[in-house]
Structure formats: structure tokens, C-alpha cells
Regions:
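The feature captures the beta-strand-to-loop junction immediately N-terminal to the Walker
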Residues: 39-41
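Conserved ABC transporter NBD signature motif
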Residues: 62-70
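Conserved ABC ATPase "signature" region
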Residues: 103, 118-136
Length: 241
């Protein structure tokens, strides 16, 4: 299910820390307008895989391609203009409005001084609009709900104007309403905005509803790219967990 249209591709990728790979022989790809969902037990390597695809960890083998080009050929700024990672955020931000927090996503465009142009401010407003959070712009980031915080984190990633967005457990700590709302936004962004999305999820029922394609990650290894029908067969889920 991988082809030349894939925006983010892993070829025979090996990932991990230290000298021994955690997982190897990983092959996957995601196209514009497509959502690829990673499922599997805790500690299997989903976060490590996402961080490697994002360029935060160096591969221990194999290749990551972004828009057909080796990820290592991009500068950090060039990579950030094409790919964004939304990871869990726990650090407290002192007296930071949601607008200012989202505007930090403009760093690939503002240069070292971080001065926002009119275009930058427009992109911040657009990102807040896309996630339904314009009304939070002037609120203190520390004083909003978990569901609102996830929307703001997503808006900051979208502010980079990426072609690919990676999300590590974006529904963690949300109630069921918050989970559904966030995944609905993601689905709209992918299918209407032609964004390529790779995300990890624990909730299998939600993963089955949102996924266009699925990759199963377990300590024993990583599957190829599967259809939801293949991935969520009862015997496959029993073997995975």
C-alpha cells in the first residue's frame, strides 16, 4: 500500500536507543489526505517510531523520506516547514496566552528574533479557526481544560503549515466527548485539507473509525501497512495484545 505519492515514508527503518534496535525492518508510508494509525501495547515503540519519523531521533538503520527526499538532507527549518510533531505537553507555561503559545509554531518562518509579521498573525488565527479555538486566543494556556489544551497544541503544529503531521497519543487524558471532537477535527484536516497524518492511539474503537490505514506495533515487530479490515480482525488484535 506504499507508493510514490507517499509524503512520509520509512524504508527498512530500525529505531531505538543505544546500540540495540528496539524495532527494525519498518516499512510504511502515508499519502496526502490519508490517516495512518499506529496501534499496539504500551512500551512497544510507537512513540520512538514517531520521534524517528520526525527527525528527533536518528535512525539506527534504514531511511526516512519526506516528500521523496532523505530526511537528513533537510535543515531543521526546512523540515519544520513540511512536518510537525504534536507530542504530549506537560511543561507549565508562565503567563502565556493561547495565541502566543500557538504563535510559537511560526518559528520556521520568523527567524531568530521570532517577530511575527502580519502573515504570521494571520496563520495563527487560521490555525485557531481550524481547531475551533479562536475564542481561546486570549486565555491563559495554563487555565484551560485538557480538551482545549489539545486543540491549542494541534493549532501550534498546524501553524507550521506542514504537509505531514505526527501525533503521539493526542487523545490521552480526554473524556470521550473530547476524544471524538479532536479526531473529527483531524479527519476533516486530512480529508479536506490534504494533510498526511500519522498518529498513535490506544482506543481501538476510535482507531478503527478514523484510520485509512493501520500499522501494528508490538515488541515482536511492526506489521506492514494494513487496511482497517485487516488490522482489526479479532485474531490479529488478540495476537497484538
Amino acid at each position: 500500500m506504499m507508493n510514490e505519492k507517499a509524503l512520509c515514508t520509512a524504508r527498512e527503518l530500525a529505531i531505538g536507543y543505544g546500540k540495540t534496535p528496539l524495532l527494525s525492518d519498518i516499512c510504511l508510508g502515508v499519502q496526502p489526505g490519508q490517516i495512518l494509525t499506529l496501534i499496539g501495547p504500551n512500551g512497544a515503540g510507537k512513540s520512538t517510531l514517531l520521534r524517528t519519523l520526525a527527525g528527533q531521533l536518528a535512525p539506527m538503520g534504514g531511511t526516512v523520506l519526506l516528500a521523496g527526499k532523505d530526511l537528513t538532507a533537510y535543515t531543521g527549518t526546512q523540515r519544520a516547514q513540511k512536518l510537525a510533531l504534536m507530542a504530549p505537553h506537560s511543561r507549565r507555561m508562565e503567563l502565556t496566552t493561547c495565541f502566543d503559545f500557538v504563535s510559537a509554531g511560526r518559528y520556521p518562518y520568523t527567524g531568530r528574533l521570532g517577530i511575527l509579521s502580519a502573515e504570521d498573525r494571520q496563520q495563527v488565527h487560521r490555525a485557531l479557526e481550524l481547531v475551533g479555538a479562536v475564542h481561546l486566543a486570549d486565555r491563559d494556556f495554563n487555565r484551560i481544560s485538557d480538551g482545549q489544551r489539545q486543540r491549542i497544541l494541534l493549532a501550534r503544529a498546524l501553524c507550521q503549515q506542514p504537509e505531514v503531521i505526527l501525533l503521539d497519543e493526542p487523545t490521552s487524558f480526554l473524556d470521550i466527548k473530547g476524544k471524538i471532537e479532536l479526531l473529527t477535527i483531524l479527519k476533516e484536516l486530512a480529508h479536506t485539507g490534504q494533510l498526511a497524518v500519522i498518529l498513535s492511539l490506544h482506543e481501538l474503537e476510535l482507531a478503527e473509525k478514523i484510520a485509512d490505514t493501520v500499522v501494528c506495533v508490538s515488541p515482536a515487530g511492526v506489521s506492514g501497512v494494513l487496511t482497517p479490515e485487516q488490522a482489526f480482525q479479532p485474531e490479529n488484535i488478540r495476537a497484538l495484545y
